[in-house]
């Protein structure tokens, strides 16, 4: 699925990503501007924190976005990638960054479905939500990137992602 601009929670099937989108929307409401990183409190996202990563938008001398840097990687991201890439750079324009590029360009949340082929031979499909943040309220300088693995009924892995997902879903269901 190609990256899609998200305007309403109903456009997102996954309960974890819906909760993160609703939180971002709440922080953006009534401001007439994008929320800043300073507006985001990890305590508010405790139930879904394993799904959340923060990505810094690096700009060139002309102010154009060119590279992304993982500031913090959530447990889902670490499990999907098979390593913690905190601090690593990613060139904007690489296939994985389509949703990020669109969120930066539009200043709007973007949803995309991704398929990842880890070295162990399994196939993992997951939803990705990119929510833009801007210190000045306009120019995107950070992204909340949230991922939620999709599992088929009889294809649940026994790894950490599954434990994170179950715990987060149980917490969300209690609310």
Regions found by a protein language model. Name each.
Residues 1-88, 92-175:
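Intrinsically disordered, low-complexity terminal regulatory regions
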């Amino acid at each position: 699925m190609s990256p899609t601009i998200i305007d309403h929670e109903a456009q997102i099937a996954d309960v974890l990503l819906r909760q993160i989108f609703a939180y971002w929307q709440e922080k953006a409401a009534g401001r007439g501007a994008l929320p800043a990183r300073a507006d985001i409190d990890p305590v508010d996202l405790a139930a879904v924190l394993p799904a959340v990563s923060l990505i810094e938008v690096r700009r060139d001398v002309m102010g154009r976005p060119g590279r992304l840097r993982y500031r913090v990687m959530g447990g889902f991201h670490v499990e999907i990638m098979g390593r913690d890439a905190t601090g690593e750079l990613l060139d904007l324009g690489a296939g994985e960054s389509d949703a990020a590029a669109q969120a930066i360009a539009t200043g709007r949340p973007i949803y995309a479905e991704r398929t990842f082929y880890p070295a162990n031979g399994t196939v993992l499909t997951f939803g990705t939500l990119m929510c833009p943040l801007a210190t000045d309220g306009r120019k995107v300088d950070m992204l909340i990137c949230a991922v939620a693995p999709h599992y088929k009924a009889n294809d649940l892995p026994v790894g950490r992602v599954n434990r994170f997902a179950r715990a987060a879903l149980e917490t969300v269901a209690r609310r």
